[in-house]
């Protein structure tokens, strides 16, 4: 199963990067598979620590995709990284293995600490559609335009029916 998350990693100078990622989880391990090239890939190769953040706020995914990465963070407890203050929960991880691949290598990461940060308040269908639109936007070079437009048209149904003001603004941003 793929779980949508926000990975926070940093380079050796401490510059933090926020990236939306579909990760895989098994027991006390998390598998992160970034495409070449990516800042997350670079950071995890040189700094073995990161956090995997779980949020129900689709606006975070949109802002990451659009490069508006000004989020409140706190220091992790068990590694030299940060986590999203507004996330529902997060896992603090350490890279224990690098599995090489020409297109999409994998970092096998051990979970050092898991924390619950905020209460889950329920599911809004518009958020799911917005996250799916972000995934489509990140794959513009890989997918046919017609497929993307058809998917967005379908996803817009849930946004139109169920979104609040914040979700509608995020939807409009991702569709610009």
Predicted region positions:
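Basic, polyanion-binding surface patches
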Residues: 1-90, 94-176
């Amino acid at each position: 199963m793929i779980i949508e998350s926000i990975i926070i990693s940093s380079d050796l100078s401490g510059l933090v990067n926020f990236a939306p990622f579909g990760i895989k989880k098994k027991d006390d391990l998390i598998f992160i598979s970034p495409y070449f090239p990516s800042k997350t890939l670079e950071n995890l190769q040189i700094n073995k620590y990161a956090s995997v953040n779980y949020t129900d706020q689709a606006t975070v995914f949109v802002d990451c995709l659009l490069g508006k990465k000004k989020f409140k963070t706190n220091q992790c407890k068990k590694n030299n990284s940060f986590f999203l203050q507004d996330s529902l929960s997060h896992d603090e991880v350490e890279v224990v293995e690098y599995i090489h691949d020409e297109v999409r290598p994998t970092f096998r990461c051990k979970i050092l600490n898991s924390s619950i940060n905020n209460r889950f308040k329920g599911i809004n269908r518009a958020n799911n559609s917005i996250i799916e639109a972000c995934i489509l936007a990140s794959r513009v070079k890989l997918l046919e335009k017609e497929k993307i437009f058809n998917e967005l048209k379908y996803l817009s149904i849930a946004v139109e029916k169920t979104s609040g003001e914040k979700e509608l603004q995020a939807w409009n941003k991702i569709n610009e």
